[in-house]
Amino acid sequence: MSLTRIIGKVFVPRQRALERHLNEGEALQRAVLDHLIEAAKDTEYGRNHAFATIKGYDDFVGQVPVNTYEELKGDIDRMRQGETDILWPGRVKWYAKSSGTTNDKSKFIPVSSEGLQKIHYAGGRDSVAIYLRNNPQSRMFDGKGLILGGSHAPNYNLKDSLVGDLSAILIENINPLVNLVRVPKKQTALLSDFEVKRERIAQEAMNKNVTNISGVPSWMLSVLTCMMEMTGKKHLEEVWPNIEVFFHGGVAFTPYRKQYEQLITSPRMHYMETYNASEGFFGIQDDPTDKSMLLMLDYGVFYEFIPMDGGDPVPLWGVETGKNYAMVISTSCGLWRYEIGDTVQFTSTNPYKFIISGRTKHFINAFGEELIVDNAEQGLAYACEQTGAEVLEYTAAPVFMDANAKCRHQWLIEFSKRPQDLQLFADLLDKRLQEINSDYEAKRYKDITLQHLEIIEARPNLFNDWLKLRGKLGGQNKVPRLSNSREHIDQLLSLNKVSGER
């Protein structure tokens, strides 16, 4: 009997428990809220908001405000100084370093011991449980898994608090038994210089029997490409003949899918999306034929959703399919009614399944067009399909007024395979955006409000060079896809040596 068959039996009880997500979503979420309130009622935050008097969701909403990072920052800073019982019981030792706010370069998201085990690691375990349920012939544990971690090794900060990328924190605290089926070595995984780490990982992993890989698609592709160059091979299965699954998250997979399918031609290869962030682990793609993800309802996360078209937050049982919501979470790491910054759309409410539609700050609405990241991904996928092009990285922002008084969207795109006709690619992208976004279509009518979009071709490695200059190469760092501001795109254009306008 294979090792996977033996280990797989451990996941059977959880596979059965996940069936509760089909029709007990509200009950699961109410139980999570009750646990969070009871656990934190004697903390400073719990006393200040009278947690002991909260009897249900309505009381919770009436007594606890919706918070941004800035509003919790003072408490988090005190926790980092070593104070206890502030937002969550006891002392919180670990803090996940995340991209910053308007006022700060970085955010420091508390990661409690309970949150580490019952949110972050629970998500990893459930990803495997669901994969094994869907693929009973899997042999993933008969080999090793390549886990691509973040670019900041955990380091001692204030009062012995520890700070690092979430992925680095997970590697630091992982069960030692997992190291028996994982590559690379911990020292390599936690290297801060991504360019050095990429080569070390390739060297350590190329002669191993790797069956599964986990990480951010863009950075994993860089590692795999490096390994192909070292080995002189064309396809990944020539190096790892038993590779079978890629657990990916952090950025949308659509722009990278074609490149992975060219790199890995094995018919046994599977791709499974997860939604994990510094703040928690929220969703898993439970059906390989459906790009939407199952919302994980029985971790230490209570969800609320703010309609992007206006209105008060609603609990899970108040959401509607097809609407765009900003996600709000309360967690066993001490985040209370915290705006995470992501937007989602539900595709089903039985079970609760969703897609990530974008970021609350990553959109273009300069002229009332309300373009979101999901629109952009669909538009690019269509243009690539029609032209045979492949997009590696991109960003877009508005041009508010040029010398001819014309407003438009400006796209900066790095292609791994350039379209033969860039004008046609731009036309197809513009056409598809109008088909899927009625607001964009209305603003494009007769070019009155919004002119035809402009595409500028980025030179090779432009986006990586930009991230490197900002000290954000590798790990969970990502390129902002859409922005109402020109701050990012202007910085990128100044670095760009190729001006291939449409």
Question: Where in the sequence are the language-model features?
Answer:
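Short coil/turn connectors at secondary-structure junctions
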Residues: 105, 141-143, 242-243, 269
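Extended alpha-helical, oligomerization-prone segments that build pores/tubes and scaffolds
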Residues: 121-124, 129-145, 180-184, 200
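Active-site diphosphate/adenylate-binding microenvironment
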Residues: 27, 31-96, 106-111, 118, ...
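Ser/Thr-glycine-rich phosphate-binding loops at phosphate-binding pockets of nucleotides
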Residues: 95-104, 277-279, 346
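Short, charged helix-to-loop "capping" segments that act as catalytic/coupling loops
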Residues: 105, 115-119, 263-270
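Short small-residue beta-strand/loop micro-motif enriched in glycine and branched aliphatics
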Residues: 104-109, 363-366
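Conserved AMP-binding loop of ANL adenylate-forming enzymes
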Residues: 130-176
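Active-site glycine/GP-rich loop and adjacent strand/helix microenvironment
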Residues: 1-52, 60-67, 75-82, 167-502
